[in-house]
């Protein structure tokens, strides 16, 4: 029988090396694994993912994968990083898919973090009426 994978004790260094790979598929696998580790009491994995968001900010395809992984890191820092994307990336037909992914990632965070961030975004007049309405509806759905 194969040993069971335990993300709390698995060495992180090889995954970090893979996470900075120039080969997109290799990096994506590592990001997903780092997200799993972050969810399972490995905050250093989540912090590394937040740093990768800074590195890959210009590549929305990679960023879409990264924000999904960050959504597994239940922290105020993750909520703030996801919220910041709505200010950093202008809403347009070309960025809509990415911003929708950011919204999905934000909703995946623990409800109190997600609700607080969505409410803040919904009340911010710097954002479009359409997005503010979506944030408000998403926060309302969290309340069930």
Question: Which residues does each PLM region occupy?
Answer:
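Structural detector for internal amphipathic alpha-helices that build alpha-solenoid repeat scaffolds
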Residues: 1-8, 20-42, 51-54, 61-76, ...
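HEAT/HEAT-like alpha-solenoid repeats
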Residues: 13-24, 47-58, 80-94, 119-127
């Amino acid at each position: 029988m194969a040993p069971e994978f335990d993300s709390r004790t698995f060495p992180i260094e090889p995954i970090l090396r893979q996470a900075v790979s120039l080969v997109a598929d290799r990096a994506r696998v590592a990001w997903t694994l780092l997200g799993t580790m972050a969810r399972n009491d490995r905050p250093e994995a989540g912090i590394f993912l937040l740093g990768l968001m800074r590195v890959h900010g210009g590549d929305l395809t990679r960023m879409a994968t990264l924000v999904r992984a960050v959504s597994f890191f239940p922290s105020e820092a993750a909520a703030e990083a996801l919220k910041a994307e709505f200010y950093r990336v202008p809403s347009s037909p070309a960025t809509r898919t990415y911003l929708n992914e950011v919204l999905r990632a934000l909703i995946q965070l623990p409800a109190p973090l997600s609700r607080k961030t969505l409410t803040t975004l919904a009340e911010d007049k710097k954002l479009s009426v359409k997005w503010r309405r979506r944030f408000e509806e998403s926060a309302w759905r969290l309340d069930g």
